[in-house]
Amino acid sequence: MAQSKHGLTKEMTMKYRMEGCVDGHKFVITGEGIGYPFKGKQAINLCVVEGGPLPFAEDILSAAFNYGNRVFTEYPQDIVDYFKNSCPAGYTWDRSFLFEDGAVCICNADITVSVEENCMYHESKFYGVNFPADGPVMKKMTDNWEPSCEKIIPVPKQGILKGDVSMYLLLKDGGRLRCQFDTVYKAKSVPRKMPDWHFIQHKLTREDRSDAKNQKWHLTEHAIASGSALP
């Protein structure tokens, strides 16, 4: 399959590993999937290999896996694609999650491309505290994230991008739980060109695929970058 100058192909495999701890409960999750960098689509299968079953809603982790890899975003030609341009060396990100019920999470990830394997590796660490025992996350009353739009803000002097988005967890009772995401994306190599500010719309979808032995789920994402629709 033909590669771009960044070691990316039209279709790539992905391997994920997350180590985490939420309110004292430690866990390890691994996953594999297929992604289409230039179509902005990806799909992964995840499995809790240590610490399962999780005593909280796995939806809080979804944004660290799929929304966690911005290489799989469809970019128009008139916007510089910072994420693909960072490959094959890749990039890192650090993110804070502030939930409206008082819970706080932090996550960081390291993303690299193996040109030889045509594979993208995603290693992350996730920590969460202060989830109310009677809240929707600990009671597992969530049902995916509502589609969202992240504003991407360049910081040229530092060679980084900042991401700002309020996302909403859909609840099984019909309600919503708001979470503020603040992210810093940093390429491992010095960016040759920085993008202007822009938006990334993304939709995450989780499907439970657990069996008698392991907690498993399937995640898909579609992400598209754009400028303002207003002059």
Swiss-Prot record:
User: Which keywords belong to this entry?
Assistant: Chromophore, Luminescence, Photoprotein
Q: Where is this cross-link: 5-imidazolinone (Asn-Gly)?
A: N66-G68
Q: Which Gene3D superfamilies match?
A: Green fluorescent protein (2.40.155.10)
Is Repeat among the key words of this record? no
Q: How is it used?
A: Fluorescent proteins have become a useful and ubiquitous tool for making chimeric proteins, where they function as a fluorescent protein tag. Typically they tolerate N- and C-terminal fusion to a broad variety of proteins. They have been expressed in most known cell types and are used as a noninvasive fluorescent marker in living cells and organisms. They enable a wide range of applications where they have functioned as a cell lineage tracer, reporter of gene expression, or as a measure of protein-protein interactions.
Q: Which domain of life is it from?
A: Eukaryota
> InterPro entries from the entry?
GFP (IPR009017), GFP-related (IPR011584)
- Which is a GO BP term held by this UniProt record? bioluminescence
Signal peptide range equals none
On tissue specificity, the annotation reads: Tentacle and oral disk.
Post-translationally, this protein is described as follows, namely: Contains a chromophore consisting of modified amino acid residues. The chromophore is formed by autocatalytic backbone condensation between Xaa-N and Gly-(N+2), and oxidation of Tyr-(N+1) to didehydrotyrosine. Maturation of the chromophore requires nothing other than molecular oxygen. The precise stereochemistry of the tyrosine has not been determined.
Described function: Pigment protein that is yellow-green in color.
Please report which protein family the annotation says this sequence is part of.
Belongs to the GFP family.
Identify this protein by name: GFP-like fluorescent chromoprotein FP506
